[in-house]
């Protein structure tokens, strides 16, 4: 193909490595990285390409709680830089802490779309076929499935 990275490409990579505090990982093979480290590397790799939109499928799956929070904070920071972040995520409590807009999909169709007001017990019961309690403590909203 004949393409090799130029000076600007290398500078952008170095800048992104520093921005994401990945210097200690730069020379390691990806099979040596933890799930959280690998996810940060994948996101950084995508950002080097300077996208306007970042589309992610379950970016926090298989991560421990610490790394889930790190990845979600990172994605929130990216969105504050003017990059649109669209993600599929099934952890509603995590989504409620970090997302600005929700699109609830059922069988490939939009069930509801909007802010946290669309996260209702009724919508979630239709969506998951499980009774769910929505708890608003004044500062955060939580969803908890009812146990039989």
Descriptions of predicted regions:
Residues 4, 29-33, 37:
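Conserved ABC ATPase signature
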Residues 6-25:
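Conserved ABC ATPase "signature" region
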Residues 50:
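Conserved catalytic motifs of ABC-family nucleotide-binding domains
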Residues 54-58:
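Catalytic Walker B motif of ABC-type/P-loop ATPase nucleotide-binding domains
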Residues 89-90:
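H-loop/switch region of ABC-family ATPase nucleotide-binding domains
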Residues 103, 107-112, 117-118:
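Conserved switch/coupling elements of ABC/ABC-like ATPase nucleotide-binding domains
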Residues 121-122, 127-148:
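ABC ATPase nucleotide-binding domains
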């Amino acid at each position: 193909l004949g393409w090799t990275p130029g000076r600007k490409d290398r500078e952008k990579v170095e800048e992104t490595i520093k921005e994401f505090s990945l210097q200690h990982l730069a020379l390691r093979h990806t099979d040596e990285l933890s799930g959280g480290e690998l996810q940060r590397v994948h996101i950084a790799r995508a950002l080097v390409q300077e996208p306007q939109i970042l589309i992610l499928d379950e970016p926090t799956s298989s991560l421990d709680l610490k790394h889930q929070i790190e990845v979600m904070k990172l994605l929130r920071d990216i969105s504050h830089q003017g990059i649109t972040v669209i993600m599929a995520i099934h952890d509603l409590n995590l989504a409620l802490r970090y997302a600005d807009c929700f699109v609830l999909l059922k069988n490939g169709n939009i069930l509801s779309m909007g802010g946290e007001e669309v996260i209702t017990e009724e919508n979630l019961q239709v969506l998951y076929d499980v009774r769910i309690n929505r708890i608003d403590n004044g500062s955060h909203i939580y969803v908890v499935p009812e146990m039989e």
